Design a protein with these regions (language model features):
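Alpha-helical interface subdomain recognition
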Residues: 1-83, 88, 100-105, 112, ...
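Short glycine/proline-enriched turns and hinge-like loops at secondary-structure junctions
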Residues: 64-65, 132-134, 158-162, 176-179, ...
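Short Gly/Pro-enriched turn/cap motifs at secondary-structure boundaries
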Residues: 86-87, 113, 128-131, 155-158, ...
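Well-ordered alpha-helical segments within folded domains of soluble proteins
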Residues: 89-94
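Short beta-strand-to-turn element immediately C-terminal to the catalytic PLP-Schiff-base lysine
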Residues: 98-101, 141, 167-171, 184-186, ...
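A short, Trp-centered hydrophobic/proline-enriched beta-strand micro-motif
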Residues: 116-124
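Flexible, small-/acidic-enriched active-site or ligand-binding loops
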Residues: 135-137, 188-219
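A short core secondary-structure module
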Residues: 146-194
Length: 351
């Protein structure tokens, strides 16, 4: 396996890093304190090619791979996890569509995303169904050449700004996971009711809402794949997107470590920087170790899917490890900064 990034990947990393440093970091505090949705930042990310990177060239897209997404994601999450979540949410919504949709759907809904700024949302999670996707209760009943959708979704990123949703439904409740079907649903369709914006720690400017579908009529041709294939398509989408989710934790952890190093080198106690105390320096060394390990897990999972290998196990391991690693490093960063670690005037509190 080649561990070095290609020249194109290095350029992509540098582009994302520059954008995070110049466009995201300076605005992160404002958006976290106000909760204002960073629409202008998202539009700039779209303009320079950091969004929708997996759309196929035949639909005017860049056709990039999952490793490219991982490279971009680490830098954007280093800048601000909430803004990165909003910027990269399209990837999750697009994944099942790119995997399972026919060309008509891609021309109607996907190709326009390369021509003008548009957002999409992945509407799968429900109050009683998160990782247990087969437990969804949202229904879709066929009536003529339409399906009528009823049900509720929750924790839907970019819901209030999305132009369309990928919605997972049950078309045959008696068939278990084989009775699940996905649809693309235009957000302007009558019967869609938006819930209130949720205010989440570290994610205050990300637009996360519940969605209720009341007799929402969707043309049958907007079905993703065939009836009953929704669960399989959704699981395949997770294999593609979990490395990108996991690397977000690496980016946040890296930011926490850098803030810790900066503070530990400038904060003096008993006549010397606290970095010279082994209790601090060992803690930061462990941060660096775990960040490197997490990044490699993400790269491995992305490389596997890019090269035709099933990565379900590796992607799940990466997501599990990186989430716990990030939580631990951010907690340690608060300890390094002491009282400043949980003060809103300092960046570690938000992480």
């Amino acid at each position: 396996m080649e561990f070095a990034l290609s020249s194109e990947q290095k350029e992509l990393r540098d582009l994302a890093r520059k954008f995070a440093k110049e466009e995201i970091r300076p605005k992160a505090e404002h958006h976290d304190h106000t909760g204002e949705y960073p629409l202008a930042v998202l539009k700039k990310a779209w303009e320079i090619g950091l969004m929708n990177i997996h759309i196929e060239p035949r639909f005017n897209g860049a056709g990039m791979q999952e490793l490219d997404d991982v490279i971009i994601g680490e830098e954007l999450f280093w800048g601000c996890s909430a803004m990165a979540t909003a910027i990269l949410a399209n990837n999750l919504a697009l994944a099942p569509v790119l995997l399972g949709a026919n060309d008509r759907i891609k021309k109607e809904f996907v190709q326009p995303m390369t021509e003008e700024f548009k957002l999409a949302a992945y509407a799968v999670t429900e109050p009683g169904a998160g990782s247990d996707v087969a437990a969804i209760r949202t229904s879709a009943k066929k009536v003529g050449d339409e399906y009528i959708i009823n049900g509720s979704k929750m924790w839907i990123t970019n819901a209030g700004y999305a132009d369309w949703f990928f919605v997972l439904t049950k078309t045959d409740p008696s068939a278990g996971h084989k009775g699940i079907t996905g649809f693309i649903v235009d957000s302007k369709t009558p019967g869609i009711i938006m819930g209130k914006k949720e205010i989440n720690m570290g994610q205050k400017c990300s637009d996360t809402r519940g969605i209720t579908f009341e007799d929402v009529k969707v043309p049958a041709w907007q079905m993703i794949g065939r009836e009953g294939e929704g669960f399989k398509i959704a699981m395949g989408a997770f294999d593609h997107t979990r490395p990108g989710v996991a690397i977000g934790a690496v980016g946040v952890a890296r930011a926490a470590m850098e803030h810790s190093i900066q503070y530990a080198n400038t904060r003096n106690t008993f006549g010397r920087p606290i970095m010279e105390n082994q209790g601090i320096s060992f803690m930061i060394a462990e941060m660096a170790r775990d960040i490197e390990a997490g990044r490699l897990l993400c790269y491995q999972a992305a490389w596997m899917i890019d090269n035709g290998f099933r990565n379900t196990y590796q992607a799940s391991i990466a997501k599990m490890f990186c989430a716990d690693m990030c939580m631990r490093i951010c907690t340690d960063a608060v300890q390094v900064l002491g009282g400043y670690g949980f003060n809103t005037e300092y960046p570690v509190e938000k992480l």
